[in-house]
Amino acid sequence: MTPKLLILLFFLGSFFLQAQNLVWKTNMNDAIKMCDDERKPLLIFFTASGTSQKIQSEIFATPDFMDWSSENIILLKLDLSDPSISSEEKEQNVKLKEALGIDELPQVCLATASIRRNKPTINKLGMLEYKMGGAKKWISEAKIILRGE
């Protein structure tokens, strides 16, 4: 192989390995506890099989999103079509979706989450959809929501 091709493969491999380092919680209770412990807001990604994957490939899989999310938020991915979760957990996820006003998938909701008197509380801050413009633009919109503007 030519050196240029090897260098290109190295950088592409590094990018994909880095994108896989995102730590998504898939259990709502675990994510709420982590938010409460770390005092960080929650990014809830509602998805299902057959929905567009653009937000994942063009936003979540970028180094910019990885850097920002690791420092600023707790990631929770709720796949409403996941056959491996219990019916109780699936029902809990659907109730959360309805309570937050999520009516189409995929959808991202930013929220605060805490535990008071052993009861979890989630307060919706705002919602974000996929928009063309890249991760930096998406992150700046998320920051506006998180600041309450």
Listing of model-derived features with the role each one plays in the protein:
Residues I32, Q53-S70:
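Typically the conserved alpha-helix immediately C-terminal to a functionally engaged Cys/Sec
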Residues M1-N21:
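Bacterial Sec-dependent N-terminal signal peptides
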Residues D36-D37, D67-S70, L100-E104:
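Extracellular/periplasmic catalytic domains that process cell-envelope and extracellular macromolecules
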Residues A99, D103-E149:
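Non-catalytic, surface beta->alpha helical segment in thiol-disulfide oxidoreductase systems
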